Amino acid sequence: SETFDKFCTILFKKALEKEIAAIGITDYFSIDNYKKVKAFISNIDTSTDFTKEEIITVKRILIIPNVELRILPVTDSGRLVNVHCLFNPAYEDSLENNFFGSIEYSAGLGKKYKMNRQGLIDLGKSLDSSLNNEKAYIKGVDSFVVTHSALQKLLDENSGFRENVIIAVSNSNRDGASAFQKHYDLFEDAKESSLDAVRKSIYCISNCI
């Protein structure tokens, strides 16, 4: 789409056509696009692309912030496991402190970077000091990974976070937890490999697959 508003217009026209009641707005390590979609809806009364009836219906659609994480370890296909965190929209204001500011990426040598915008910028610049903030942010997003233990710790220690998130894991054999199953070929006599334990631990923190 030429602009984000044009994208939103196409998105909601299709949602109206398909009678969709809820939409998850996905971002890696942020809810920036979710906020943009909410802003579009806030200003939809001035849009000439929708009828009054369509505007009423669009405002009734549940918009959900969906943060996608890349989880270690790497799968058999060389990909990180993709995990989606779908949040209660009412929890939005708490995400910066309780989620993005709570998970860290360890780069070794005592260097840690938070999963918030500044942390991602700092990570990007640590990899390429010539980058400006915007390009460093993109570099940081491309490089940041989350460990299963970090997400598990957050779920264990923060009941407010736990009560306001639904965690979904892909079951794909490329970037999902099922990709670990291919490693069984390396353990001919083993009934249960350590990678099976990893797969099960990822499933245990997930609410849906």
Regions found by a protein language model. Give the residues of each.
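A metal-dependent hydrolase metal-coordination microenvironment
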Residues: 1-126, 130
